[in-house]
C-alpha cells in the first residue's frame, strides 16, 4: 500500500513479516507468521486473569506478554456467549449460538460448529482428546478445509454490513496469517464478513476464523499498532492472541 513499509522480526524460532495492501479500496493489513513450536502461539488476558474488570489496550497486553506480534481476540468480556478455554480450563460454556476456534498445544486450529458440543462434559473431553490450550468464540468460520464459507446471518459481528474486520488463519503446520481490514487514508471501504472471507481465501489460507471487529480490530507488531484501528485509536479490551519467540528474553533482545 502506498506510503506503508514492510515490517519484520526474525530469530531461530520465529519469522514474522507484516505488510499492507490496498484491495478494492480497503486498507488490508496482513502478517505472516512461522514458528518453531506450537507453544509460541498463545492467548493473553487483561490483568492476566479471566473475568477481570480491568480492560487494557492491546499494545499494553502485547508488551506485558513480550509478544512479537499480536491480534485482538474475541473480547470475551464484552459478551456472555460462546466457549472459553484458557490454560486448558473451561471458564465459559454457552455454545448454542457461535462457532468456536480451539488452539492445540501443537499449534493447530480446530473449529466447532453450533450443536457439536452440547455439554460441559463433551467440551472437557474435547479439550483433553485434542490437547487444547485455549479457545476463542466469535466467528464465523471464514474458510474451512480449503472451502470458503458464506454467512448471511450470525449472532455477532454485524456480518452483513461494511465493518472493520480481524481474522486469524492457519496456512500450514506452524504457519499462520493474521488479517485486519480497516479504513486508512484514502482507502475508505470496510467489508462484510463474506468479503473478508474472500480476502483471506485469496491468500491461499485453508482455515480461517473471524475475530472481533470494529474498533477492536487491531494488530500489534514490534510493540506498536500496525494497522489503523477505527478513529485512529486503540480501544481497551480483554484479550489478545499472540506469537512469542522461544528464545529467552536476554537473547531475544540482543
Show which residues each predicted segment covers.
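Short hydrophobic-aromatic micro-motifs
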Residues: 69, 109-111, 142-144, 150, ...
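A short, polar/proline- and glycine-enriched secondary-structure boundary/capping micro-motif
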Residues: 52-55, 119-126, 187-194
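Short, solvent-exposed aromatic-acidic interface loops
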Residues: 45-52, 115-119, 181-185
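Extended Lys/Arg-rich, glycine-bearing segments that form polyanion-binding/interaction patches
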Residues: 94, 98-132
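Zymogen propeptides
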Residues: 1-100, 108-111
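Conserved, well-ordered active-site substructure
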Residues: 80-105, 151-206, 211, 216-254
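Short, conserved active-site entrance elements at the starts or edges of catalytic domains
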Residues: 132-155
Amino acid at each position: 500500500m502506498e506510503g506503508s513499509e514492510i515490517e519484520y522480526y526474525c530469530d531461530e524460532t520465529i519469522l514474522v513479516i507484516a505488510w499492507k495492501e490496498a484491495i478494492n479500496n480497503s486498507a488490508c493489513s496482513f502478517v505472516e507468521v512461522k514458528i518453531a513450536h506450537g507453544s509460541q502461539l498463545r492467548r493473553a488476558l487483561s490483568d492476566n486473569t479471566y473475568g477481570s474488570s480491568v480492560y487494557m489496550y492491546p499494545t499494553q497486553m502485547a508488551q506485558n506478554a513480550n509478544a512479537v506480534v499480536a491480534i485482538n481476540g474475541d473480547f470475551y468480556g464484552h459478551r456472555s456467549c460462546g466457549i472459553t478455554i484458557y490454560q486448558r480450563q473451561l471458564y465459559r460454556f454457552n455454545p448454542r449460538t457461535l462457532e468456536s476456534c480451539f488452539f492445540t498445544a501443537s499449534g493447530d486450529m480446530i473449529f466447532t460448529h453450533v450443536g457439536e458440543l452440547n455439554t460441559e462434559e463433551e467440551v472437557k473431553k474435547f479439550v483433553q482428546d485434542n490437547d487444547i490450550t485455549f479457545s476463542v468464540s466469535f466467528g464465523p468460520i471464514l474458510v474451512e478445509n480449503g472451502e470458503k464459507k458464506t454467512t448471511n446471518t450470525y449472532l455477532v459481528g454485524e456480518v452483513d454490513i461494511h465493518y472493520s474486520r480481524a481474522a486469524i488463519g492457519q496456512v500450514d503446520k506452524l504457519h499462520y496469517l493474521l488479517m485486519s481490514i480497516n479504513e486508512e487514508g484514502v482507502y475508505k471501504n470496510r467489508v462484510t464478513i463474506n468479503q473478508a472471507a474472500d480476502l483471506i481465501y485469496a491468500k491461499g489460507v485453508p482455515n480461517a476464523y473471524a475475530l472481533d471487529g470494529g474498533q477492536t480490530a487491531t494488530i500489534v507488531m514490534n510493540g506498536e499498532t500496525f494497522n489503523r484501528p477505527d478513529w485512529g485509536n486503540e480501544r481497551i479490551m480483554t484479550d489478545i492472541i499472540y506469537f512469542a519467540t522461544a528464545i529467552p528474553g536476554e537473547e531475544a533482545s540482543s
